[in-house]
């Protein structure tokens, strides 16, 4: 339902655990508004099949972007299903030496395409870049071509 960034969820458990969770949530993300919660309930109850309709769209976007990147020499894993793809830094020793943050900045400056450095997601993300698949497919293919052309 494209609500991932809103961090909506529910918890069932013993009252002491739920009370502790409330304390943490109140400090960490201030909970969610009632309007957003009601909207999520409507999405879950009225459009239960809608996410399935997105699978084909994101699969096509993923496949076309990966085709362009792989055609340009990138070695990218194929995610099962996600709104993004993960790109390892190119094998070139000079690029790998730059690291994901500097290389993402380089790509942005040369191509105008913003890739998220994987190190922002923790130690396991170092050496990787994340490319979101949230634009129309033709725009994503163009973005992938521009990323390929930005590699020295």
Can you annotate each of these PLM segments?
Residues 1-152:
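PLP-dependent class I/II
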């Amino acid at each position: 339902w494209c609500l991932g960034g809103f961090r909506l969820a529910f918890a069932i458990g013993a009252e002491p655990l739920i009370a502790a969770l409330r304390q943490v949530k109140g400090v960490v993300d201030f909970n969610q508004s009632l309007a957003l919660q009601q909207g999520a309930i409507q999405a879950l109850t009225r459009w239960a099949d809608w996410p399935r309709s997105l699978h084909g769209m994101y699969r096509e976007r993923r496949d076309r972007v990966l085709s362009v990147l792989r055609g340009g020499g990138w070695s990218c894993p194929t995610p099962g299903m996600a709104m993004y793809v993960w790109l390892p830094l190119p094998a070139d020793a000079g690029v790998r030496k730059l690291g994901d943050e500097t290389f993402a900045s380089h790509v942005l400056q040369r191509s105008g395409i913003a890739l998220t450095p994987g190190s922002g997601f923790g130690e396991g993300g170092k050496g990787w870049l994340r490319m979101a698949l949230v634009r129309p497919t033709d725009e994503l293919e163009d973005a992938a071509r521009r990323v390929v052309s930005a590699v020295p």
